[in-house]
Amino acid sequence: MLSFMKIRRNPTRPVTIGSITIGDGHPIAVQSMTATKTQNIDATVEQAEALHARGAGVVRIAVDSDKDAEALAEIRKQTQANLAVDLQENFRLAEKVAPHVDKIRYNPGHLYHHARELTWQEKVRYLIDTAGSNNCAVRIGVNCGSVDPAKKEKYDHDDSITPMLESALEHCELVDSLGFHNFVVSLKDSDPSKVVQVNTLFAEKRPDVALHLGVTEAGMPPDGIIKTRIAFEQLIGKGIGDTVRVSLTLPNPRKPEEIDAGKQIVEDIHAGRVRSVVKFDDSKLNIISCPSCSRVENEAFIDLAAKVKEMTTFAQEYSITIAVMGCRVNGPGETDDADLGLWCGPAKVNLKRGPEALGAFGYDEILPKLKQELDDLIAAKQ
């Protein structure tokens, strides 16, 4: 955690996450997420401890199965880090992991895949009851690539802000009505300007709710750090934000660099070293890529993201977005809005043009296919 020069902060409610408290004027906590396979207990403990030692206030771990939950119980015994669990579709795993973590993160857009006979309100009640009985904080994590489908259908396809905002506010209202207040909200997009917009709107309507800031799929450094800095400087500079994560596409041994980047940005803001006069140029090539986590099924994803960046330098002057995602959980949905999208499986990389699937190709075949599609896009723009 960081505490430097006094800056104005929104009067958010305090949220206790293990040994730290965020909100209510407490120092902004920097956090990260393990990228090792959760069932590889030794590797996950090693990475959690490395992040904790570097200054992570919270370390998040993905759990997608009963075996992951069993591994998490052992991981808890071997690390001093404050642990958050990342639940995707299988909300019922909350009961198995809650005794071993300090925070539960759920995504409102992922509550529709399991137990469809239950309403989303019933599922949230279950999550909140479980968190409360185990003294866990909760993060309501709204993401641009997996927004509540009922909310997306109400608005124009180009309006990604309103569905996210409505979903977050609706979930806050329900959780408050259940008498639970130890929660934080995140609203993330890969476009830093949208991150600023949606978090500003949320803070205007719910200045009492603590906010976790982040630019999702920010990509590789230094670009990913620049995108994140643009959003953080504008938000934290006006009092918005209680905890942050810098999501970077990095090899596993370099994950602690996310903590370094987050601490540096927050320290610079506190010291008045603001650089947002350098704006993110969305009229040029934009490559977004996820920061990797335990759901990545082939670590060649990291190398592929770097090769895509290198191969596409010739297209820098074109307004084209290419998304490179590491798993089948988030990849299919979070590449829909890109001009060209790649999401990686264990042996194949799935290529898309917008929401249209173009096929699955080997890791050694995908770059020529991507180059062909990119050439076609550029030709169409000329």
From Swiss-Prot:
Cofactor binding note from Swiss-Prot or TrEMBL: Binds 1 [4Fe-4S] cluster.
Positions bound to [4Fe-4S] cluster: 290, 293, 327, 334
Catalysis performed (reactions): (2E)-4-hydroxy-3-methylbut-2-enyl diphosphate + oxidized [flavodoxin] + H2O + 2 H(+) = 2-C-methyl-D-erythritol 2,4-cyclic diphosphate + reduced [flavodoxin]
TM annotation in the entry: none
A biological process term (GO) from this entry: isopentenyl diphosphate biosynthetic process, methylerythritol 4-phosphate pathway
Keywords from the UniProt entry: 4Fe-4S, Iron, Iron-sulfur, Isoprene biosynthesis, Metal-binding, Oxidoreductase
Swiss-Prot/TrEMBL cofactor(s): [4Fe-4S] cluster
Pathway noted in the entry: Isoprenoid biosynthesis; isopentenyl diphosphate biosynthesis via DXP pathway; isopentenyl diphosphate from 1-deoxy-D-xylulose 5-phosphate: step 5/6
EC number: 1.17.7.3
GO molecular function (one): 4-hydroxy-3-methylbut-2-en-1-yl diphosphate synthase activity (ferredoxin)
Superkingdom of the organism of origin: Bacteria
Cross-referenced Pfam families: GcpE (PF04551)
Protein family according to the UniProt entry: Belongs to the IspG family.
NCBIfam families registered for this protein in UniProt: ispG_gcpE
Job description of the protein: Converts 2C-methyl-D-erythritol 2,4-cyclodiphosphate (ME-2,4cPP) into 1-hydroxy-2-methyl-2-(E)-butenyl 4-diphosphate.
Protein name: 4-hydroxy-3-methylbut-2-en-1-yl diphosphate synthase (flavodoxin)
